Amino acid sequence: PPPTVTPATPVAAVAPAQAAEVWQLAPAVHLYPDASGPASGGPWLILLESTHPTTPLAGAVGDLLDKMLRALGLHQHPQVWLAVLQRPGGLPMAAEMAGSLAPVDWQPLPAQLAHTLQTVQPARVLLLGQKVAQTVLERHEPVGQLRQQRFDLAGHAAAVSYDPSFLLRTSQPKKYKAQTWADLQFAAQLPARSK
């Protein structure tokens, strides 16, 4: 008799990735875990959009961000954290695109931000980028009007500046990089807790 062929077990179809309906936040990443300098001024939390939520210092944007933070001496600070936001309508990023073998645990922004603030206990929060600043602070002004001001974010002092990706594509990089440097210095001078 001819050999019998057992039909292959059907493979469950993988559901297509669903677009996010609300702003989402990835877990905070410890930027400089090997830093051995003093934690002067307390922990930092940086919020921005990035195509590398688990490795935010990757790529040209990450390289510029790293240079900005190093200029401020934060590469020696043991408590610098960064969390990436994703806009509504964005598809969840595949792990390999995120520079990690682990999936990105995107969570709705309000709950994840509250959890991140509670966990990190930042002395200051730096909001980079117009949409990030407007969404987190629930404001409508452009970055140019929000920068060089102190905001309260659930009891934590917060400051706003330009996103590194904007600095790479603007036609006036010197102007905006100088303003961003001033904003970083402003953020570094913020008291640990917002009044």
Regions found by a protein language model. Give the residues of each.
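A polyanion-binding, active-site-adjacent surface
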Residues: 1-195
